[in-house]
C-alpha cells in the first residue's frame, strides 16, 4: 500500500553500487551556525556513535550518569547503520558530573564537553555534513555525470524512507489514529506518526510534480520559498522569467505543503495538483486538521552543497552538505542504484 519508490528527476541511474556494507560507509556530522557559550544550565556533549540509534545512546548515557532520559535532549536523530557525530545536552543546573567528559560505552564515546544556556532541540542545526562510500560502482562515468548535474539543478526534496519507519510502519500507525480513531497517549509517538503522515502526503504531491517535470518550475499559484528560509510568497504569473532566473541561482524554490489547517495560499495549476492528492487522502487530511496540525511548506528542490568526490578502482567517496531536515538518501538515489 505504501510504496516508497518515488519517481526520480533524472531517470533510473545506469550505475549500481554497494552502500552501507560497513557503518563507516555512511558518516554524518552535525553542523551548527553558532558556538556554545561555555556556561549555563546544560552540559553539552559531542558524541560519536557507531551502529546505534540516537535513542539507544541517550538511554545508555542516562543510565551511566543516573539521570532521567527526559533531561537529555538532541537537535536531530541520526541513522543507526552509520558512523555519526552529534551533540546531546543534559539539563544539570549548577551540577558537576564527575568524569562525564571521558564517558564511553559499547558503540559510543564522548569527544567534547562544554556548557550552554539552552537545551538542544530541532531547529538548532544548520545542516549535516555527509561522507559516503559507494563500493563496486559499475558505471563511474554515469555517476560523475549525475553528480555534476545535481550540483547545479538539485534533486527533489523528498522525505527519506527513515521517516516512515520499517516497512512503512509509522504510516500504518498514522492510518489507525487518523482514520480508525485509535488513541495514542504517548505524545512523542503520536507526533512521529503525524509527521510521517504529513511527509507521505508531501512526497505524493512532489512526486506528481516530478512526473510532470514541474517540480523545479514556478507554476501559476505556486508557493515560492526562499532557500534556507521559511519565508514564502505566491507566484501570480504562469511562467515568470525572473523567478526562473532566481531558481537557477539557487535563491528560491517552488514549495509543496505539509498538510494541516490551510491558509488557502495556493491557486491555479499548483492548487489542482495538491487537491488531486487531498481528495484521494481526504480522511488523513481531515484527521490532521482535527488534531490541530497547521499547514507548513517545504521547498521542492534540495541542493547538495560543497560536493566533492574521489574515485579509486570502483570505490567512490562522496562528501556534501545538506540543510537540516534533508535526507542524503534522496541524493544518492539520483546517482546510483543501491
Curated annotation (Swiss-Prot):
Segments forming domain TRUD: 154-303
A Gene Ontology cellular-component term: cytosol
Active site: 79 (nucleophile)
Keyword Glycosyltransferase: no
GO BP annotations listed: tRNA pseudouridine synthesis
Catalysed reactions, as listed in the record: uridine(13) in tRNA = pseudouridine(13) in tRNA
Enzyme Commission numbers on file: 5.4.99.27
Any matching Pfam family: TruD
Keyword Transit peptide: no
Gene Ontology MF terms: RNA binding; tRNA pseudouridine(13) synthase activity
Keywords, ordered alphabetically: Isomerase, tRNA processing
General function of this protein: Responsible for synthesis of pseudouridine from uracil-13 in transfer RNAs.
Family under the similarity heading: Belongs to the pseudouridine synthase TruD family.
Name of the molecule in the record: tRNA pseudouridine synthase D
Amino acid at each position: 500500500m505504501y510504496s516508497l519508490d518515488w519517481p526520480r528527476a533524472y531517470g533510473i541511474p545506469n550505475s549500481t553500487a554497494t552502500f552501507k556494507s560497513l557503518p563507516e560507509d555512511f558518516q554524518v556530522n552535525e553542523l551548527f551556525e553558532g558556538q556554545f557559550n561555555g556556561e549555563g544550565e546544560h552540559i553539552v556533549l559531542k558524541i560519536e556513535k557507531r551502529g546505534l540509534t540516537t535513542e539507544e545512546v541517550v538511554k545508555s548515557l542516562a543510565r551511566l550518569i543516573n539521570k532521567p532520559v527526559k533531561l537529555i535532549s538532541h537537535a536531530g536523530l541520526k541513522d543507526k547503520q552509520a558512523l555519526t557525530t552529534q551533540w546531546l545536552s543534559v539539563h544539570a543546573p549548577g551540577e558537576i558530573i564527575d568524569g562525564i567528559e571521558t564517558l564511553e560505552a559499547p558503540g559510543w564515546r564522548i569527544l567534547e564537553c562544554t556548557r550552554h544556556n539552552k537545551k538542544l532541540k530541532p531547529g538548532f542545526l544548520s545542516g549535516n555534513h555527509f561522507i559516503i562510500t559507494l563500493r563496486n560502482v559499475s558505471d563511474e562515468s554515469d555517476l560523475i555525470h549525475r553528480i555534476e548535474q545535481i550540483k547545479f539543478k538539485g534533486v527533489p526534496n523528498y522525505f527519506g524512507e527513515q521517516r516512515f519507519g520499517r516497512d512503512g510502519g509509522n504510516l500504518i500507525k498514522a492510518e489507525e489514529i487518523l482514520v480508525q480513531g485509535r488513541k495514542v497517549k504517548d505524545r512523542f509517538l503520536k507526533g512521529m506518526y503525524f509527521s510521517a503522515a504529513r511527509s507521505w502526503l508531501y512526497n505524493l504531491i512532489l512526486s506528481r510534480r516530478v512526473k510532470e517535470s514541474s517540480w523545479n518550475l514556478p507554476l501559476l499559484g505556486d508557493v515560492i520559498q526562499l532557500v534556507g528560509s521559511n519565508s514564502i510568497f505566491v507566484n501570480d504569473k504562469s511562467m515568470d522569467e525572473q523567478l526562473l532566473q532566481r531558481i537557477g541561482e539557487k535563491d528560491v524554490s517552488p514549495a509543496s505543503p505539509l498538510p494541516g489547517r490551510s491558509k488557502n495560499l495556493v491557486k491555479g495549476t499548483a492548487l489542482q495538483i495538491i487537491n488531486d492528492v487531498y481528495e484521494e487522502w481526504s480522511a488523513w487530511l481531515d484527521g490532521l486538521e482535527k488534531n490541530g496540525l497547521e499547514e507548513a511548506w517545504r521547498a521542492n528542490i534540495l541542493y547538495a552543497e560543497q560536493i566533492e568526490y574521489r574515485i579509486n578502482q570502483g570505490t567512490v567517496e562522496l562528501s556534501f552538505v545538506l540543510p537540516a531536515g534533508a535526507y542524503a538518501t534522496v541524493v544518492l538515489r539520483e546517482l546510483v542504484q543501491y
